[in-house]
Amino acid sequence: MARAALSAAPSNPRLLRVALLLLLLVAAGRRAAGASVATELRCQCLQTLQGIHPKNIQSVNVKSPGPHCAQTEVIATLKNGRKACLNPASPIVKKIIEKMLNSDKSN
């Protein structure tokens, strides 16, 4: 019985190393590919600001409701590189979005 177990193992240690390396690479690749999907399958804005001064905003990204999140999300990229979630129902945020949309149409 011990002999049967030994004969089932590969006799070439180099082949075993290559097979293990390939297995690790495949597992790491699947995990990395799944990581980005997992973050996209939920709302990005857990807390929102009621407003922010427009001079601090570099760009605004409005995400419509979808299978990943049931609410509209407004994500402002600030001039300092940070991102801030804004409340889409806030009158100030609505004006900021309108201003950004109008400036995009005029360019």
Swiss-Prot record:
**CDD domains from the UniProt entry:** Chemokine_CXC
Gene Ontology biological process: actin cytoskeleton organization; chemotaxis; G protein-coupled receptor signaling pathway; immune response; inflammatory response; intracellular signal transduction; negative regulation of cell population proliferation; nervous system development
The positions making up the signal sequence are 1-34
**What GO cellular component is one of the record's annotations?**
extracellular region
Residue pairs linked by disulfide bridges in the UniProt entry: 43-69, 45-85
The entry's comment on post-translational modification says: N-terminal processed forms GRO-alpha(4-73), GRO-alpha(5-73) and GRO-alpha(6-73) are produced by proteolytic cleavage after secretion from peripheral blood monocytes.
Q: Which UniProt keywords apply?
A: Cytokine, Disulfide bond, Growth factor, Inflammatory response, Secreted, Signal
Q: Which GO terms describe its molecular function?
A: chemokine activity; enzyme activator activity; growth factor activity; signaling receptor binding
What's the domain of life for this entry?
A: Eukaryota
Protein localization = Secreted
Q: Which Pfam families match?
A: IL8 (PF00048)
Describe the function of this protein. Has chemotactic activity for neutrophils. May play a role in inflammation and exerts its effects on endothelial cells in an autocrine fashion. In vitro, the processed forms GRO-alpha(4-73), GRO-alpha(5-73) and GRO-alpha(6-73) show a 30-fold higher chemotactic activity.
Question: Which family does the UniProt entry place this protein in?
Answer: Belongs to the intercrine alpha (chemokine CxC) family.
| Protein name listed in UniProt | Growth-regulated alpha protein
What organism does the record attribute this protein to?
Answer: Homo sapiens
Q: Give the lineage.
A: Eukaryota, Metazoa, Chordata, Craniata, Vertebrata
